[in-house]
Amino acid sequence: MHRIEIANTRHQRVEVWKSTMQVEFRVQQAVHAWWHAQRFLTGLAWDNLIAASLLHPSRAPGSILMLGLAGGTTFHGLRHLLPNTRLTAVDIDGEIVELARKHMHLNNLNCEVHIADAYEWVRNSKQQFDVVIDDVYLAGTNDVFRPGNWDAAAMGQLQQLLAPGGILLTNLVRGVGHRALQIRIRDLFRDSFSSVREVRTPAGLNETLCGGEQVLPAAALRQWREKFHSSRDRNLWDKITVRTLPKRQPK
């Protein structure tokens, strides 16, 4: 791959790297978004979000909202699997969205994109969705971070966006510097939903929490395997794990 562009947006410095078949957006030397002409999975956090969206009790949700679109990697995979689903996204960085239109074929995904602060948009929205994905991270000096407050009030605002039977997904970075937030959000999910599952890939440093009245088990993912034409994608799909989080013990 070779670097073809550098964009200094209001929120981050984005390097665009490209080869014949794929494109990467890199922020602080980490891959921030990825697109491939023939493949959809990476073994990283985007796979978790794609898989977790399919744990909706309907098995094929009719509408998905994503908070934090970036280059559209998750929507690239979801559109492949769900050609008729209504896809809506909110991202604060309009410049990276334009880069995605230019380099990652975002316009081909037939998704509605709002340029706004995601949590402010949530507070003002009256819409409801089968799946709500919270993937809001911003680039800090040395690492990514979550803006805003993650508390019961914030959880309640996200829950109001869920249609009956809907599920909420949250992408969490694991590891040093992120553990306290991970514990807090896990506890909020277990307090807020009757069913909570954790979705991971073995090579990734992230987990996706998935909460709702009903969240399907790992077996629900099997039906989607053959939708991937690449053997690499199928192998990565097979490695995704889904684990039930138990209810919190009373103090």
For each feature predicted by the language model, list its residue ranges.
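SAM/dcSAM-binding transferase cores
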Residues: 1-18, 32-39, 43, 54-55, ...
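The AdoMet/dcAdoMet-binding core of the Class I SAM-like
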Residues: 6-7, 18, 40-167, 177-181, ...
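S-adenosyl-L-methionine
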Residues: 23-27
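Conserved S-adenosyl-L-methionine
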Residues: 193-204
